[in-house]
A protein has these predicted regions:
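Hydrophobic/small residue at the entry helix of a nucleotide-binding pocket
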Residues: 150
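NAD(P)H dinucleotide-binding glycine-rich loop of Rossmann-like/cofactor-binding domains
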Residues: 45, 85-147
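Glycine-rich phosphate-binding loop and adjacent beta-alpha segment
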Residues: 169-172, 217-288, 322
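Adenosine-nucleotide cofactor-binding segment
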Residues: 159-218, 269-272
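C-terminal hydrophobic helical "lid"/dimerization subdomain
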Residues: 270-322
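Short glycine-centered segments of the SAM/dcSAM-binding site in methyltransferase folds
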Residues: 82, 140, 164, 230-231, ...
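Glycine-rich beta-strand-centered segment in the early N-terminal region that forms part
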Residues: 21-38, 48-90
């Protein structure tokens, strides 16, 4: 099979397009023929070595596909079932083996591309607004990178709840996308200081929660924008990881809450995974959640796909097709 293998950590150039043997499922695993694989910042973190992984490995951990073979102990699926998953490395390939307990069924009304696009980013947006900080009607959320893959979904989910959304984006094109997703106020951070603008919009009051997937370049200003006992949810590090931080600073700023959550801890059990996936896919089927799939790349172009994502040149979701 064709696959994208990493033999050493580094830049996009270490993404090698290679021939590998088709993996064989263990007793509790399923062999999935990949239809589409999602491209995410976490793939870059693994490639760079921010998240250590034994080498070599096949990058990517989000995909949709069709069951091709079953391990001897798997009874919950059959060959030909349409499935999707996230959280298991190996998606940048024609085939991948996935533990049966990590797979979700894809409803008939959801396309392969939609399923691949919804797993990691859709469930991330879902746990952020429902669990990391259970957003309520009438509250105000500041959402960074609001035209990105997670950002556009966060805006839509926050508005579905009835919250007020202040969004930050880098360009006017991205501002239009954020407004189209429902953002009440949009700040172009390259032209305006987002801290100054947010304080103006809020009449000097703090927001209830900040959803920040940017990291290093926004963190310090975020701390100045929360109400007393407000929440800063740092769920990503697109600009780099946040430097070591003195927790004592949270008290004088209003007894703030700070967390660095990961999706994997919010889909740790099969029951929670199935419930969260069903909610997200159900919102898509009902038309409440619109996915923006900006670009689809052939598998061999994984290097360019990750360059485009890291360069903040993209909006919405990027996919690889084996």
């Amino acid at each position: 099979m064709k696959a994208i293998q990493i033999e050493k950590n580094g830049g996009p150039e270490v993404l090698n397009f290679v021939d590998l043997a088709v993996p064989q499922p263990k007793p509790n695993e399923v062999l999935v023929k990949i239809s589409a694989a999602g491209i995410n910042f976490i793939d870059i973190y693994f490639r760079e070595g921010m998240y250590p992984r034994a080498l070599p490995f096949v990058d990517g951990q989000e995909a949709s596909g069709v069951v091709s073979a079953l391990g001897s102990e798997v009874t919950s699926f059959k060959v030909g079932d349409r499935v999707a998953y996230t959280g298991v490395l190996g998606a940048y390939a024609e085939f991948a083996v996935v533990p049966a307990g990590r797979l979700v069924r894809v409803p008939q009304g959801i396309t392969d591309h939609q399923a691949a696009a919804a797993m990691l980013q859709g469930m991330t947006a879902h746990y952020l607004v429902h669990d990391a900080f259970p957003l309520q009607k009438g509250q105000t959320a500041l959402i960074h990178a609001a035209a990105g893959g997670v950002g556009l979904l966060l805006v839509q989910m926050a508005k579905d709840i009835g919250a007020r959304v202040i969004a930050t984006v880098g360009t006017e094109e991205k501002a239009k996308l954020a407004r189209g997703a429902g953002a009440d106020e949009v700040i172009l951070y390259k032209e305006q200081d987002f801290e100054v603008e947010t304080k103006r919009i809020m009449d000097g009051k703090g927001v209830d929660v900040i959803y920040d997937g940017v990291g290093k370049t926004t963190f310090e200003q975020d701390l100045n924008l929360l109400r007393p006992r407000g929440y800063l949810i740092c769920f990503g590090a697109a600009s780099g990881p946040v430097p070591p931080f003195d927790l004592q600073r949270l008290a004088p700023k209003g007894s703030l809450f700070l967390t660095r959550p990961s999706l994997m801890h919010y889909i740790a059990s099969s029951e929670e995974l199935q419930r969260r996936a069903a909610d997200v896919l159900g919102m898509i089927e009902a038309g409440k959640l619109k996915l923006r799939i900006e670009h689809v790349y052939p598998l061999k172009d994984a290097q360019q796909a990750q360059r485009d994502l890291a360069g903040r040149k993209t909006t919405g979701k990027l996919l690889l097709i084996p």
